[in-house]
């Protein structure tokens, strides 16, 4: 039997996985479900816990606290709202090199980010997950300006933003183009370069130090 901490971690992972893939066509490539390889019991328990545990301590969009028996799904009618526990589960800390490397490889091993289209909403989801599950203060996620590949400003974070071409389906299907998350994303530097970006894992980012890029990373992230 798994411990309560293990079950809580699975719930957090599933929340992140579903949040990042909240709309059809989120993936640039097909990624694995974070619960693949887990026992069917754990998968079933995580599924049941989603409706129960996520509602505890939550507020509805109109400011009403969820009561016992309510589910967050009943009130989560705004796709742009991102819901997580009110308070972080662990002590707060700033991002460090070691923490960035560990966090990157954790995300990579769980299939939570690699190959996902970038959008402002997904960036917020990742920040909230890092804050609530890892205690990482959300001043860390920033990237070099475009056009082209955007490199992380935090030394040790192994995910960069890479421009990609849309799938043939996305280019030719009018309905798919209108609804595709790639069409609704925004450049992280706030400039429209007409590029579609995806997160890509690059372990070399943990060893290739470029002082000009990583200088004053926290100050840059706050701007």
UniProtKB/Swiss-Prot annotation:
The keyword Lipoprotein appears for this protein: yes
Region (Acidic): 73-81
Superkingdom assignment: Viruses
Sites of N-myristoyl glycine lipidation: 2
Localization per record: Host cell membrane
InterPro entries: HIV-1_Nef_core_sf (IPR027481), HIV_Nef (IPR001558)
GO molecular function, one term: GTP binding
Region feature (Mediates dimerization): 124-140
Gene Ontology CC annotations of this record: host cell plasma membrane; membrane
One Pfam family per UniProt: F-protein
Membrane topology term: Lipid-anchor
Keywords of the record: Host cell membrane, Host membrane, Host-virus interaction, Lipoprotein, Membrane, Myristate, Viral immunoevasion, Virulence
Summary of subunit composition and partner proteins: Homodimer. Interacts with host CD247/TCRZ; this interaction induces down-regulation of cell surface TCR/CD3 complexes.
UniProt family annotation: Belongs to the lentivirus primate group Nef protein family.
Function comment: Seems to play a role in optimizing the host cell environment for viral replication without causing cell death by apoptosis. Enhances virus infectivity and pathogenicity. Probably involved in viral immune evasion mechanisms. In infected CD4(+) T-lymphocytes, down-regulates cell surface expression of CD4, CD28, CD3, and MHC-I or MHC-II molecules.
Miscellaneous note of the record: This is an African green monkey isolate.
Domain characteristics, as noted in the entry: The N-terminal domain is composed of the N-myristoyl glycine and of a cluster of positively charged amino acids. It is required for inner plasma membrane targeting of Nef.
Protein name in UniProt: Protein Nef
């Amino acid at each position: 039997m798994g411990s309560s901490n293990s079950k809580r971690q699975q719930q957090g992972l599933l929340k992140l996985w579903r949040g990042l893939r909240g709309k059809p066509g989120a993936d640039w490539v097909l990624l694995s479900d974070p619960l693949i390889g887990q026992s069917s019991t754990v998968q079933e328990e995580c599924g049941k816990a989603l409706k129960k545990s996520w509602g505890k301590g939550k507020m509805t969009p109109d400011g009403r606290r969820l009561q016992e028996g309510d589910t967050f799904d009943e009130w989560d009618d705004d796709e742009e709202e991102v819901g997580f526990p009110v308070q972080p589960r662990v002590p707060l800390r700033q991002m460090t090199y070691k923490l960035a490397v560990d966090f990157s490889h954790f995300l990579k091993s769980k299939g939570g980010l690699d190959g996902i289209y970038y959008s402002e909403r997904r960036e917020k989801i990742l920040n909230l997950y890092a804050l609530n599950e890892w205690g990482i203060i959300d001043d860390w996620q920033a990237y070099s300006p475009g056009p082209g590949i955007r490199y992380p400003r935090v030394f040790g974070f192994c995910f960069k933003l890479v421009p990609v071409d849309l799938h043939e389906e996305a280019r030719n299907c009018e309905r798919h183009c209108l609804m595709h998350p790639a069409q609704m994303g925004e450049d992280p530097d706030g400039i429209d370069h007409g590029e579609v970006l995806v997160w890509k894992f690059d372990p070399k980012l943990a060893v290739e130090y470029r002082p000009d890029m990583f200088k004053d990373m926290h100050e840059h992230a706050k701007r």
